[in-house]
Design a protein with these regions (language model features):
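N-terminal regulatory/sensing modules of transcriptional regulators
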Residues: 9-10, 57, 97, 124-126, ...
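Generic long, charged, amphipathic alpha-helical segments
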Residues: 176-235, 279-291
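Helix-turn-helix DNA-binding segment
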Residues: 277, 283-361
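Tandem amphipathic alpha-helical repeat scaffolds
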Residues: 1-11, 31-48, 71-87, 111-126, ...
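Amphipathic alpha-helical segments of tetratricopeptide repeats
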Residues: 17-28, 57-68, 97-108, 137-148, ...
Length: 361
């Protein structure tokens, strides 16, 4: 399962989903939180954020009920990180605080690292660069203390972003040089893309930043992390706008805004729209049929039912009564303005939750 944390998850994904199906079929409550947390981590590092939240919530709930404090810490740290990217400040801080407390009690260094990363990403998304830099600097120290050197876990790219917003160009250059060297040494696309983004942010000419960002876009295309790809396009579009190349800037910024809207990454979507407005483009209305209005349990029920399970089977998988499942399904229909499971399946697919990727199907 290590690749799930190092952005090399393809093989692990195919192994975990059959395990989850077996655990559900056997009502193996003790095994479910661990498997659910791993699947949620994979979902959160791709573009399946809505179902990732539901999966984390289920893992957290089962871990609390069964007294599995290690898995509870895992789920809380993971959910904090996801909520950070969505700009859900209260939820993120609450999950991170509990995860940090449990990490200290249990000696879970990895989860402390993850919760700290969540707080840094929250501050960065909210525009609090100084707070973000403080958390990322602490994260660097934690990684060093635990002997963790893999560049995929490094906050280097985010720290460069924070330092530049603070006007600390020398510090940004120093961190970027270290991060780029580590990314090149590993040679994997996810970190290479972020390394090229750092170079694009720091380049002192239009040709220089364009070449760096274009290389970043190429590397992003080799990974499933659409959020990081959108961040690169946002940075690229911002530099193009400041270079007075409004036409090309709008192309990058529209692409970034579309991804942030689809993921419900509100602070980042707002920033992309602000950049677009600075080019003279009017903001488009948000699609009311997004999944953001569903509760995690409603979404979990939706994906199970559209994945082929009957109401009774979905109820058994989630330890609910069939009547409760039907009650939640009615609310799903009302919130989304639809009337059938076929419409629901189409909407889920349009929002990036294809049936083959859904846990438990």
């Amino acid at each position: 399962v290590g690749p799930l944390f190092l952005r090399e998850a393809g093989a692990g994904r195919s192994l975990l989903e059959p395990v989850l199906r077996t655990a559900r079929a056997r009502t193996a409550v003790g095994a479910l939180p661990f498997v659910l947390n791993l699947i949620a981590r994979d979902q959160a590092t791709t573009d399946r954020w809505a179902i990732a939240e539901a999966t984390y919530q289920e893992a957290i709930g089962l871990a609390r009920e069964s007294g599995q404090r290690t898995e509870l810490t895992f789920g809380l740290a993971g959910l904090a990180w996801l909520q950070a990217r969505r700009g859900r400040e209260q939820e993120c801080r609450g999950c991170a605080a509990e995860a940090l407390r449990l990490s200290a009690e249990l000696g879970m260094g990895l989860h402390e690292i993850w919760a700290t990363a969540a707080l840094g990403e929250l501050e960065l998304g909210l525009g609090a660069a100084a707070g973000a830099a403080g958390h990322f600097e602490r994260l660097q120290r934690l990684l060093a203390d635990h002997g963790i050197t893999d560049v995929d876990l490094s906050p280097g790219a985010d720290l460069v972003d924070a330092y530049l917003r603070l006007g600390r160009h020398d510090a940004a250059q120093r961190v970027a040089a270290q991060f780029v060297a580590a990314a090149v040494a590993k040679g994997q696309p996810w970190s290479l893309a972020r390394a090229f983004r750092c170079q694009g942010l720091l380049a002192d000419s239009e040709r220089g930043f364009a070449e760096a960002f274009e290389q970043a876009v190429v590397q992003h295309a080799l990974t499933p992390d659409s959020f990081e790809a959108a961040r690169t396009r946002l940075a690229y579009g911002g530099r193009l706008r400041r270079a007075r190349n409004r036409v090309l800037a709008r192309e990058q910024l529209r692409a970034a805004a579309e991804v942030f809207e689809r993921l419900d990454a509100r602070p980042w979507a707002d920033r992309a729209h602000a950049e677009l407005a600075a080019t003279g483009e009017t903001r488009r209305l948000r699609d009311p049929s997004s999944l953001g209005g569903l509760t995690p349990q409603e979404l979990q029920i939706a994906v199970l039912l559209t994945g082929g399970k009957t109401t009774r089977e979905a109820a058994a998988a989630l330890f609910l009564s069939p009547k409760t499942v039907e009650y939640h399904l009615r609310h799903v229909y009302q919130k989304l303005g639809i009337h059938s499971r076929d419409e629901l399946a189409l909407l889920l697919a349009a929002q990036g939750v294809p049936a083959g990727d859904r846990p438990g199907t």
